[in-house]
Amino acid sequence: MAITEIPYADYADLFIEKESHGGVFLSTCADGKNNTMTIGWGSIGFMWGKPVLTVMIRKSRYSYELIEKNPEFTVSIPIHDDFKKALGVCGSKSGRSIDKFKEASLEIMAGQKVTPPVIKGTGLHLECKVRYQQTLSADNFNQQLCDKWYSDQDWHVLYYGEIVSAYVEK
């Protein structure tokens, strides 16, 4: 399988489409343990003179524990709909108790410039190094959104990751 580096912005629309309609895989790694989860919220753009991918991870998630130890992550975007079942598994099970890669029949490939792996066969990959993070809180938050998404106080942490590599599998 060949890997072709791409300008990250060339596939920004695809990232947004897939993320908002079914999700994408976010993978982390620390202490020799890999994990992946399905995410459906985030943004892609340009900040601090760098390409940036912003993702959200709740503090209750196993991925949060790993990214706090190793501030790198990958996002694998399924170009085709072959990963619907795997996205369901990775969005509903915890990596603390199972190997989600095995459970969802996912193959991994080593990241090119970061420690976390990418999901083989998805087609599009973004590798990121965290440059800033911030925990959401009720302060200055729209009350309706706060009531809807954070009534249990399980806040997201926003991770602003510099995109250090973007590529497609061919």
Language model features: what each stretch is:
Residues M1-I39, S43-K170:
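Active-site-proximal mixed secondary-structure blocks
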